[in-house]
Regions:
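Structured beta-strand/loop patches that form or line metal/cofactor-binding pockets in enzymes
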Residues: 1-59, 65, 350
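Conserved, mostly hydrophobic/aromatic
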Residues: 32, 44, 66, 114, ...
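Metal- or metallocofactor-binding catalytic centers and their adjacent structured scaffolds
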Residues: 39-126
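Glycine-rich, aromatic-flanked loop segments that form ligand/cofactor-binding clefts
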Residues: 105, 109, 115-158
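Metal-dependent enolase-superfamily TIM-barrel catalytic cores that perform enediolate-based chemistry
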Residues: 135-256
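Shared catalytic-loop signature of beta/alpha-barrel
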Residues: 227, 233, 244-370
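Extended hydrophobic packing segments that form well-structured cores
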Residues: 371-389
Length: 389
């Protein structure tokens, strides 16, 4: 049993949307195929992943360091104790050989994307959906049957009107979502408040709204937005400041009583531990941590991050992985987390879930396909198959 090849391709997202900090006109993502010599149903088992969204393709680092380390290792050293499947933890350790501590983002996304693709192969070899494999290893065998999903929407778009924004949110509600998120910080405060008011007007009483500032604000603007947003009773106010400015985040937390959310731009367990130690976040007020596993060294390291925040008194229900894709869905279901993000209608083939996915009252039933389940996304799977051909 061995990995015979690992391939990467950079794919443009071709999107004209923007948040408060940048647009996605140049954004790319790395698609990875981990090709094994294991055969199932007459075909080699291939693990797939991509590096989520919001960070550019990272194939150069993969090809220069991480892929050669895996392919150059003794194949038996990459297997589990009974030599019946690959061991993602051992493969992660091989990729980390001769790597200096710190500087995580330079490598965490490249490593994490390959590692998640390995997990896809592991689950396929076990003939189980990944969420079930993860539940067995990391959640006492308690496998969820459905996951709460919210929409990461409300992006700024060219010539968008407030009515356009309301119409978008109505579509999400009609599709079965009960929580939606929108961007703030890309317009003057008064205009953003009008946008928030407009969305709140169309939400039913049992629906929730969150806002995302994408780390845009310095101190004065962050506190001004916190004051203006306080009356709306938001599910959370996301990334109000630089992701590593824990002192400012703690000040905002003292000033803003409703929940805060952050973490998608933290790429190591140590960064997340520093967040919960020094960032002033409050598990008793439903604050949320949003690490993106493929961008933060993968699932093995994410399990270590989960264990770390649990030691600091955080429940798993406070964890909502960033990403809006099948990977975060499987991880949320397997670990028993609070929920997953969704990107309907944006990022082309890379947004959303399986073609037959249907939400009911905010929840998405988990599939039974072996692996992550990319095979259920026809447009994305065709891209992956072309890479592996």
């Amino acid at each position: 049993m061995r990995i015979v090849d690992i391939r990467e391709s950079a794919i443009p997202l071709k999107s004209d949307i923007r948040n408060s900090s940048f647009d996605f006109s140049e954004m790319t993502t790395s698609v990875v195929a981990v090709i094994t010599d294991v055969v199932r149903d007459g075909k080699p088992v291939i693990g797939f992943a991509f590096n989520s969204t919001g960070r550019y393709a990272c194939g150069a680092a993969m090809r220069a360091r991480f892929i050669p380390r895996i392919l150059g290792a003794d194949p038996r050293s990459l297997l589990d104790e009974v030599q019946e499947n690959f061991d993602p933890g051992k493969i992660l350790a091989v990729m980390m050989q001769r790597e200096k501590s710190g500087g995580h983002c330079e490598r965490s996304i490249a490593i994490g994307t390959i590692e998640v693709a390995v997990w896809d192969a592991v689950a396929k070899i076990a003939a189980k959906p990944l969420h079930r494999v993860l539940a067995e290893r990391y959640n006492g065998g308690k496998s969820a049957t459905k996951v709460f999903c919210y929409v990461g929407g409300g992006w700024y778009a060219p010539d968008q009107t407030v009515k356009d924004l309301q119409d978008e949110m109505r579509r999400h509600l009609d599709a079965g979502y009960t929580m939606v998120k929108m961007k703030v910080g890309g317009l003057p405060l008064a205009e953003d408040v009008r946008r928030v008011e407009a969305v709140k007007r169309i939400l039913p009483a049992d629906a929730q709204l969150a806002v995302d500032a994408n780390s845009k604000f310095g101190r004065e603007e962050a506190l001004a937005y916190a004051k203006a947003l306080a009356p709306f009773g938001l599910r959370w106010f996301e990334e109000p400041c630089d992701p590593l400015d824990f002192a400012l985040l703690a000040e905002i937390a003292r000033y803003y009583d409703s929940p805060l959310a952050t973490g998608e731009n933290l790429f190591s367990t140590q960064d997340v531990e520093n967040l919960v130690r020094f960032g002033g976040l409050r598990p008793d007020r439903n604050d949320v941590i949003q690490v993106d596993p493929p961008q933060a060294y993968g699932i093995v390291q994410y399990a270590r991050t989960v264990a770390t925040v649990e030691r600091h008194g955080w429940p798993r229900s406070a964890l909502f992985p960033h990403g809006g894709n099948q990977m975060s869905l499987a991880i949320s279901g397997g670990f028993g987390l609070g929920g997953a993000e969704s990107y309907p209608g944006v990022f082309g083939a890379f947004g959303g879930f399986a073609d037959d996915a249907k939400l009911e009252r905010g929840y998405l039933a988990l599939h039974d396909r072996p692996g992550i389940g990319f095979e259920g996304q026809s447009a994305l799977y065709s891209i992956m198959c072309a890479l592996a051909a």
